[in-house]
Amino acid sequence: MRSRIPITVLTAGALVLGVAACSGGAEGSGGPDAATPGTVQTAPEQHETTVARATGDGVAVFADADDTEPVLAVPGTSTFGFRQAFLVLDESGDSLHVLVPGRPNGSTGWIRRADVELQTVDHEVEVDLGARTLTLRSGDDVVLETTVAVGAPDAPTPTGRFFVTDLLETGDPNDDYGPYAIGLSGYSKELTEFAGGDGQIGIHGTNEPASIGQAVSHGCVRVPNDVITTLATTVPVGTPVTIH
């Protein structure tokens, strides 16, 4: 994306969008990934996903279920003010094995059930970079499928298992991001900062519809504006997104 722009959180007030971009012409910087408890790359075969949402100011993350000293503290809200989400992979007693938002992509750890509220989502998004398609499913049903723009060769869209962290409205279909942007839990491997943001990737609309189907972004997935409108008003925070 070219610049920081005013946006509206779909359930809160005005903030600023700074996810890693999908328009050309801006510079970013690379850097090493931070250390984290573990990684996961593949999605389980299931139609309903359990999501843990933070209930307090922060969530302690542990390397193992029985550990007493956390290795990471995750803020209770995302950059854009949404209650922090974690994708639940497994559970053991009072602990939950989760996919953690942030670098490096695919990081996992254990959190305490007492620190979160559990929810379920039945939608999932799949992005096929080779075919340049995005598919939204609800259970076994395909809700929509569309052609997308993906990351350019020097800033490819990262692959892996992610989830929705933020749902943002720009208020302008002619904006660089189109009318909506969806923040994801993943980050660009090439850009540690971009347009005032920290290299977070997302799915958003565009004011350059001719770019759809091309490899032209700085890592985000760019979709037609009618599609991003459907996505942003359909999928909740925590919805799993698999990019391959």
Task: Walk through the language-model features, giving the residues of each.
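SH3/SH3-like beta-barrel superfamily modules
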Residues: 78-114
